[in-house]
Amino acid sequence: MTITKLSNVLTIIVLVFKLSTYGQVVSTTAALESAISNATAGTTITLADKTWSNVQLSINKIGTENEPITIQAETPGSVFFEGNSYVKMGGAYIIFKDVVFQNPSNLDTDIPVIEFKSSNDCNHCTVTNIQIDSYNGTTAQEEDTFKWILLRGTNNEVSYSSFIGKHGVGSIINDNRSSTEANYHKIHHNYFADRTPVGEINDLNDQDAIRIGSSSTSLSDSYTEVYNNYFYNFSGEIEVISNKSGKNKYYNNTFDDYQGALTLRHGNGCEVYNNFFFANKNVFSGGIRVMGEDHLIYNNYIEGVNSKKPDGSTSGGTGGINVSNGKPDSALNEYYQVKNVSIVNNTLVNCDYGLRIGTKIKSTNTLAPENLIVANNVIYENTTKAIQLTTAPIGDASIMEGNIKQNGSWDITTDTNDNISVSSGLLGSNATFYYIVSGSAAIDAGIGSYAFLTTDILGGPRSASFDTGAEELNAGGDMFPYSQSDIGVTVGFGTDKTLGLGDIIKLEQQLKIYPVPSQGAILNIALGNQTLGLVEISDMAGRLVLAKIFNTSKAEIDIQNFKTGTYIVKVQEVSKKIVIK
């Protein structure tokens, strides 16, 4: 054989090796386990479209940032893991995506559906574009603690996935934080729906959607971010989200038709902002529940909370925003005193209780909130109390100023510290939420200066003379609350179809649509320096009202014949809502 021929043969062998290593389709569990065993950085393992039963994967591999190890479906949504299936990931830079978990049987509830640990923790690992659908144990197992996703390690991500029909004790996504090491996890663009409680709402703990931390390590910081998630028809316990660590952020989430509250149970220095809560008067529903120190709570919209329990009594832990008393010498799993917390520029609409200050879940909770700022909140048509002071705040820095209510009563003195009451005109309404209107007493009424208050709940800029409440009049933001029409479009399983997650996030940042809300004849769309391509506009019923290709990075669209209402604009793989008035 000549040297040239030998070289060609070797080239072919190398090419075949690379193909078999980097891009292989497997159709049996044995082949899958073999492919995982042989995987190296850059390997992509593709699962053949079919139903897989009792798949039990234990992955211990190291990828890199530029060459992760990927396990994916041949066709997203056409690979089904059933029976007693689970995935354990250990190592670094592993991506698991596109799989549906359904039809469970003979589950071992001690083993999570997906755990970011095998023989060691997983760091820089991603679970994306999956669906876990009613993957529950038997009735006899419903009080067993069965977690769907157990986070460990650092810098991990759960995104663009749907978690539907959880029943039984155990978080959907849980980070127990067994150590005090910072996590830097990101949980975003997920859909959490149709959880049902064991017994009545709040009969048992550990029925939340997301829990970050545990009481034992709660005084250490996690730096986890939970954003752009949609919670729908969700009922488990008082904590829809349970924060039990420090320096976490919760923003741009929508809670719709739910029971419970976003609860800062333990930990300090968290931020809760730009979230929408639509409780629909469900019993035992709240907005944000506060314990601990140094939290910032701003730009949240909370509507229709109902503090009644199923038995008709009133819960001390609910309300639009509930600030708890603390317990002297509190143990880590009890109630730390609220200190140095700012509750600023929130909008509370049609709740029974708007703001509840100094509540007592237990009679031993006798420490009043200290150095509490409650400022520039809009409280609209609350039926029981706009502001309830069960225990008055203490500390020289405590102040309540610049709050505005429309009708109803409150436990503060009207016309003191710019706290005012009006009888009408504070807010208007559309099909989605109540918003600030021309002539409102909230316009330019903000008091004080807050470095964190740079935009409003919709993402529009705050002016120097800023408005009271969560929204700035005509600021042009487009971060509207999620609805059912967003599932598989902007949140949840099926969202990430062709682009990488980094590409989608960049497009979301670059895509600009203005003016919002639009009251004129022209809608402007821009995509930085990228070509727009196909632009689609649909109404909330999913009907396509415009589809046009633009070979430019900017476009003007004639909307003068559009009816008033909310529409979805889709450019490439990114969708945003707009309101036309």
Language-model features: where?
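Bacterial Sec-dependent N-terminal signal peptides
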Residues: 1-25, 501, 568
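Surface beta-loop-beta hairpin patches that serve as ligand-binding interfaces in beta-rich domains
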Residues: 440-503
